[in-house]
């Protein structure tokens, strides 16, 4: 299956790229610059494409991202600290982001003769991000089949949609994903902050997967307090 992978440069999508390269025919990685404050993630996506020997397509969505206002990822709004499932994390939603990116991905796949678009949405995303849930991915694939009817047959591949981030860590480790060469932190500093929702989720995933975490965090211990606080609610 000739598969295009939507790759942010994060742990999930880079793991998916490595898994896809071994299980299917990885054709290309597609990334998006939508004006995110953690734009450095794109360097990790580019490095993954180089490592895996496939073309890297960087789509400039900055003008679109500028119109999708109100998110801590694109506006001058502080990224909150805490557990990834807390309501405060809703400020990190970029409206319709995945739908827009997937639509472009399907267009690229159709133009290039690919058979599938793979995205690393997973169970941990369901709390906050509606365009990561199974209902959305099923509906989106139906829409795309109608949009490309008679022109191209491209499927949506979402192997992690019902899995946890810990499951992704285990699968990534089994396929030799270099986790140190991935970026998750939404704050986009020199190193992972260890306090934002994505850092907490990343640290917890390695712990639950019982896989060594090579990540350097500015606050390496905060995650456990965030998890404990959530469980106490």
Swiss-Prot record:
Function of the protein: Catalyzes the ATP-dependent conversion of 7-carboxy-7-deazaguanine (CDG) to 7-cyano-7-deazaguanine (preQ(0)).
Protein source organism: Ruegeria sp. (strain TM1040)
Free-text comment on the cofactor: Binds 1 zinc ion per subunit.
UniProt key word Metal-binding: yes
Gene Ontology terms for molecular function: ATP binding; ligase activity, forming carbon-nitrogen bonds; zinc ion binding
Cofactor: Zn(2+)
GO BP of this protein: queuosine biosynthetic process
EC number: 6.3.4.20
Gene: queC
Protein name: 7-cyano-7-deazaguanine synthase
């Amino acid at each position: 299956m000739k598969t295009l992978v939507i790759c942010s440069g994060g742990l999930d999508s880079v793991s998916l790229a490595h898994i896809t390269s071994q299980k299917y025919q990885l054709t290309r990685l597609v990334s998006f610059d939508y004006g995110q404050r953690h734009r450095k993630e794109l360097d990790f996506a580019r490095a993954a494409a180089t490592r895996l020997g496939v073309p890297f397509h960087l789509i400039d969505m900055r003008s679109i991202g500028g119109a999708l206002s109100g998110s801590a990822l694109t506006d001058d709004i502080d990224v909150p600290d805490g557990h990834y499932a807390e309501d405060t994390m809703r400020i990190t939603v970029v409206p319709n982001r995945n739908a827009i990116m997937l639509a472009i991905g399907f267009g690229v796949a159709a133009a290039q003769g690919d058979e599938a678009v793979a995205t690393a949405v997973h169970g941990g995303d369901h709390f906050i991000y509606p365009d990561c849930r199974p209902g959305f991915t099923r509906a989106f694939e139906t829409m795309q089949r109608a949009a490309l009817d008679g022109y191209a047959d491209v499927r949506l591949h979402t192997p992690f949609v019902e899995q946890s981030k810990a499951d992704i860590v285990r699968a990534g480790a089994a396929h030799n994903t270099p986790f140190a060469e991935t970026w998750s932190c939404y704050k986009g500093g020199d190193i992972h902050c260890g306090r934002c929702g994505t850092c907490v989720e990343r640290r917890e995933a390695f712990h639950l997967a019982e896989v060594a975490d090579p990540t350097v965090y500015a606050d390496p211990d905060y995650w456990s307090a965030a998890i404990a606080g959530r469980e106490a609610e």
